[in-house]
């Protein structure tokens, strides 16, 4: 199919900012179907998303910070009510979820380039199908999309090489970040990162989702589309392989010292 214009989307996460650039997409099929096309067997209305930048989040001060309330906001409103009027915009999706998606993508893929690609593809897929999303757990949906994209990538490429995070990379903490913490989180050590690299992709995904992202076994099962017993087995075997790897390499390091 020939396109009049191609959509170019780029997500860049790290160095305390995430920048999204989306160019207009139009094609003959869209015109023929009166503004609708089909992606992944789901009808999607063609939408033009404006450029988005999160760099302005660096400018937050204590006086700008709004205390959290019990009332749902942003995507939580849409998730809780299913109200189409509350459907999040591209800007809202990115602002609220980009860093968390990138964090998961990095832990799964182990390197910045693949993490950026996975983050980009996740948000493109989310934005194209958000109109068909059934209210439930929005973050769980993001976990599922990101993880499945990672596993698809691994199957295509074979083995993914893990790399340590750059020394100057900061990450968002898991819960209730304040302005000074919003782009800061702890990093995994190089040894643990290398140990994760040694795991089969399915084990790695289960361990990352459980021990780093903090998902329950039930949530991991829903994310990976496997039974609870399979989740337990993958996590158990993955942890055992991590212990074996770390013990072996710790011994080798001690002998060479």
From Swiss-Prot:
- Oligomeric and partner information: Interacts transiently with the RNA polymerase catalytic core formed by RpoA, RpoB, RpoC and RpoZ (2 alpha, 1 beta, 1 beta' and 1 omega subunit) to form the RNA polymerase holoenzyme that can initiate transcription. Interacts (via sigma-70 factor domain 4) with RseA; interaction is abrogated by treatment of cells with H(2)O(2) or detergent.
| Biological-process GO terms, alphabetical | DNA-templated transcription initiation
According to UniProt, the name of this protein is ECF RNA polymerase sigma factor SigE
Residue intervals passing through the bilayer = none
What protein family is recorded? Belongs to the sigma-70 factor family. ECF subfamily.
Question: What is the gene name?
Answer: sigE
> Which purpose does this protein serve, as stated in its record?
Sigma factors are initiation factors that promote the attachment of RNA polymerase to specific initiation sites and are then released. Extracytoplasmic function (ECF) sigma factors are held in an inactive form by an anti-sigma factor until released.
Query: What does the record note as the disruption phenotype of the gene behind this chain?
Result: Reduced survival after heat shock (50 degrees Celsius), treatment at pH 4.0, exposure to detergent and oxidative stress (5 mM H(2)O(2)). Additionally an inducible protective response to oxidative stress present in the wild type was absent in the mutant.
Q: Where do the record's region annotations for Sigma-70 factor domain-2 lie?
A: 87-153
> Whereabouts does the entry annotate DNA binding, in residue ranges?
211-230
- Keywords from the UniProt entry: DNA-binding, Sigma factor, Transcription, Transcription regulation
- Read off the NCBIfam families from this record: PRK09647.1, sigma70-ECF
Origin superkingdom: Bacteria
| Gene3D superfamilies xref list | 1.10.1740.10, Winged helix-like DNA-binding domain superfamily/Winged helix DNA-binding domain
One of the entry's Gene Ontology molecular-function terms is: sigma factor activity
Q: Where is this region: Sigma-70 factor domain-4?
A: 186-236
Task: Kindly give the Pfam families that the UniProt entry links to this protein.
Answer: Sigma70_r2, Sigma70_r4_2
What species was this sequence derived from? Mycolicibacterium smegmatis (strain ATCC 700084 / mc(2)155) (Mycobacterium smegmatis)
Q: Is DNA-binding one of the keywords?
A: yes
Comment text on domains: The sigma-70 factor domain-2 mediates sequence-specific interaction with the -10 element in promoter DNA, and plays an important role in melting the double-stranded DNA and the formation of the transcription bubble. The sigma-70 factor domain-2 mediates interaction with the RNA polymerase subunits RpoB and RpoC.
Q: Where is this motif: Polymerase core binding?
A: 111-114
């Amino acid at each position: 199919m020939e396109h009049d214009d191609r959509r170019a989307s780029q997500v860049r996460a790290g160095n305390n900012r995430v920048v999204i650039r989306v160019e207009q997409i139009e094609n003959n099929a869209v015109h023929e179907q009166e503004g609708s096309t089909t992606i992944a067997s789901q009808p999607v209305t063609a939408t033009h998303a404006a450029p988005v930048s999160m760099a302005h989040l660096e400018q937050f001060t204590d006086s700008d910070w709004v205390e959290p309330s019990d009332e749902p906001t942003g995507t939580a409103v849409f998730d809780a009510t299913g109200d189409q009027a509350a459907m999040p915009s591209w800007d809202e999706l990115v602002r609220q979820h980009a860093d968390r998606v990138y964090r998961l993508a990095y832990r799964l893929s182990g390197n910045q380039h693949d993490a950026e690609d996975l983050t980009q593809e996740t948000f493109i897929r989310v934005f194209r199908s958000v109109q068909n999303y059934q209210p439930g757990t929005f973050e769980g949906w993001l976990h599922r999309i990101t993880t499945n994209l990672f596993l698809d990538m691994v199957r295509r490429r074979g083995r993914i090489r893990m790399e340590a995070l750059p020394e100057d990379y900061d990450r968002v903490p898991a819960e209730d970040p304040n302005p000074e913490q919003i782009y800061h989180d702890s990093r995994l050590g190089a040894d643990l990162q290398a140990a994760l690299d040694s795991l089969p992709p399915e084990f790695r995904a289960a361990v990352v989702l459980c021990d780093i992202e903090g998902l329950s076994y039930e949530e991991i099962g829903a994310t990976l589309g496997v039974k609870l017993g399979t989740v337990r087995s993958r996590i158990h075997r993955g942890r055992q392989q991590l212990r074996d790897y770390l013990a072996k390499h710790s011994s080798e390091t001690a002998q060479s010292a």
